[in-house]
Amino acid sequence: MSVFSLKIDIADNKFFNGETSPLFSQSQAKLARQFHQKIAGYRPTPLCALDDLANLFGVKKILVKDESKRFGLNAFKMLGGAYAIAQLLCEKYHLDIETLSFEHLKNAIGEKMTFATTTDGNHGRGVAWAAQQLGQNAVIYMPKGSAQERVDAILNLGAECIVTDMNYDDTVRLTMQHAHQHGWEVVQDTAWEGYTKIPTWIMQGYATLADEAVEQMREMGVTPTHVLLQAGVGAMAGGVLGYLVDVYSPQNLHSIIVEPDKADCIYRSGVKGDIVNVGGDMATIMAGLACGEPNPLGWEILRNCATQFISCQDSVAALGMRVLGNPYGNDPRIISGESGAVGLGVLAAVHYHPQRQSLMEKLALNKDAVVLVISTEGDTDVKHYREVVWEGKHAVAP
């Protein structure tokens, strides 16, 4: 077997206290999923068991939730955007989301509205999709360096898309400024003082994928011992972990939060025990994770309940893309993009590492481990996907 060393810095969470949040409980997840189930085309995304790979890596099971199959959008993010917009409109028009369908919501809107957000690609596409479904407008801002394919995907949903010359976090501030000037509704997946309601709804919407996964694991007769969750601002990681620890308890679930080393604000916050922002270009292939300022709502859950934080180089994500796209043995093939594949990439990087055994022990990975991984996106940038998987971009160095 080849042996090579990729950067995977691991920090134990010294500030873990196991305090869960009622905002991200099982009941909140059920409410969100009940709404999503009323949207035409809803079906749970696959939970793929990579049994041959699990055997190779020395664990009992590897389960990958494949979010490339979500509503034809190639990513999970619409779960948050659509749910938040629905909640916003229900509040505005005094409607009950528990009894309302997406179609009824569309008919209830008595005015033309514009929803604005900042995105690296997937969240903005989800907001644009929801706005289009409801007959409303969307203006989507993207940071510099955004792939044209991701821009086109948003434009194809009828939204306006503006690529700035700023990084993600500065683009969020610009979006807020423009929205205030024009009277738009901001649907952003990060929070700040005075802006928490919509990000909370977004995070609750993300819990639908976790609720599906728990149901699917129960049908398989397995209970997860580990979950690897990638983080940008930490909205998905916080929302999903908040739900999972309500189901399994924080003490019984070994949760690992993974980030690119060029945008590892959650990792650095985890080391300090308080929010640490990261500035600059944050140049990483994991575009969906290139965020330097943690969502305070997500951070609180991660600080309280995450077991460990990992900061890793881009080659870890690229390795995950190649492993998922070229399955071992009889395992199913999964097309996973840069931000989607990094969790599996960590498992692969550990397997090939010269200090494999000590890393396995550090992460409590053994023959009894049942590991849940979320592939949050498919090949949302096909050109770059092929450069990585076909042409060996960001290859490992032996």
Language-model segments: residues:
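PLP-dependent amino-acid enzyme catalytic core
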Residues: M1-P398
